[in-house]
Amino acid sequence: MAEIIIKKRHAIKKGQLTSLMTKLKESIGDDAELYTAPMIEIAETTSRFNIYLINKKPILMEKDEWAFPTLRGAILRPFSGRRIVVDMGAVPYMVNGADIMRPGIVSVTPDVKAGYPALAVDESHGKPLAVVLPLYDADGILALGKGKAAKNLHYVGDELWNLEL
């Protein structure tokens, strides 16, 4: 990810909030309620995502068809579901931005869908390591013998993680 430059930043309107919450509810279900706040700002950036700020922290990210918590959002406001658990041997690669390969996957929650973000967590502590875009549904990932299972979108230490406002 290249350096993120904020072009514009403003509070979102009620209609935008409704659209955002609908997309978020599709992604993480009823846990979307964890991400409501009196004021949510949108930061239009040079990155491939729109970033939503709650209390001046980048908590949510949105692309055309989906919205999902950033790693900071997942840590500050933990939610259940949409998880791919990776073994501890994969952790050093994940935090350097590597995609998830099938041999490193321990388990997958059944709600993981191809093309919609999921959270990659370590098997020991369940700590979020990355936001990934699965290439297959949960059953497809588990059926894979080898190969790439998910693309890394946002990881600990990348530009979005280090974004300070």
What are the functions of these language-model segments?
Residues 2-49, 54-107, 111-114, 118-165:
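Beta-strand/loop-dominated core regions that host nucleotide or nucleotide-derived cofactor-binding catalytic loops
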